[in-house]
């Protein structure tokens, strides 16, 4: 029975390797592609940037990120190094990252330098009237083993995870943006009620 399991495992590894090589040939050396996500947030770009660029606060809306630490001193910007404890597909890894672009309030990019290589780019664009913000997130993650097969299998799942992360970002920003307005309206509403017959 053990020999049968070993043979089955070796056969699976061989098939996985062959499929990965076939996918690599199809990609013509381009490598696994980016995963694209987008959301529109009912808040000005500066408010969205403040939440998105709060590195240590990203665990509030990226549920796959369990903890994050900034490892370099000084303000966050190009060259800032950090690491995050991430859990996806039941696998926990420490993900060291380096910020490669930091252009408030429109662009934030980083590279993944750990087990999973790749990079991510957040682009923010104000909506037509300035009260909304369009957030685009392009993320490339390259698995350490069978990268093309891993990306082909994992991309649909990661796409759903990243889209859910952006939707949580939207909900968080919109809730925080609405709180001061609701508080400010409450006294005015009470005063207006006092003037009613």
Predicted segments with their positions:
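Beta-strand/loop substructures that line and gate deep hydrophobic ligand-binding cavities in soluble
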Residues: 4, 109-164, 169-171, 180, ...
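Hydrophobic ligand-binding cavity/cleft-lining segments
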Residues: 4-77, 184, 192-197
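Intrinsic-disorder/low-complexity, polar/charged segments enriched in Ser/Thr/Lys/Arg/Asp/Glu/Gln
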Residues: 32-40, 81-83, 94, 107, ...
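Hydrophobic/aromatic beta-strand elements that line small-molecule binding cavities or substrate pockets
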Residues: 37-39, 70, 95-101, 112, ...
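A short, structured loop/turn motif at beta-sheet edges
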Residues: 45, 73-78, 100-105, 123-134
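Hydrophobic pocket/interface hotspot
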Residues: 47-52, 58, 82-84, 99, ...
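Solvent-exposed coil/turn segments that connect beta secondary-structure elements
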Residues: 87-89, 102-104, 115, 140
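Short, cysteine-centered beta-strand-loop-beta hairpins and adjacent loop/turn segments enriched
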Residues: 87-93, 143-146
């Amino acid at each position: 029975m053990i020999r049968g399991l070993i043979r089955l495992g070796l056969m699976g590894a061989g098939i996985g390797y062959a499929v990965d090589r076939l996918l690599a040939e199809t990609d013509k050396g381009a490598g696994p592609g980016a995963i694209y996500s987008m959301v529109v947030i009912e808040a000005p770009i500066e408010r969205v940037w403040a939440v998105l660029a709060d590195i240590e606060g990203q665990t509030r809306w990226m549920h796959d990120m369990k903890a994050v630490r900034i490892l370099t001193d000084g303000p966050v910007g190009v060259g800032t190094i950090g690491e995050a404890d991430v859990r996806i597909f039941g696998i926990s890894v420490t993900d060291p990252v380096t910020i490669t672009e930091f252009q408030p309030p429109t662009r934030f990019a980083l590279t993944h330098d750990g087990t999973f290589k790749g990079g991510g780019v957040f682009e923010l664009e104000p909506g037509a009237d300035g009260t909304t913000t369009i957030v685009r997130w392009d993320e490339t993650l390259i698995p350490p083993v069978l990268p093309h097969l891993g990306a082909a299998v994992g991309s649909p799942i990661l796409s759903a995870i990243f889209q859910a992360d952006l939707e949580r970002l939207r909900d968080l920003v919109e809730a925080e943006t609405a709180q001061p307005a609701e508080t400010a309206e409450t006294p005015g509403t009470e005063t207006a009620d006092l003037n009613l017959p």
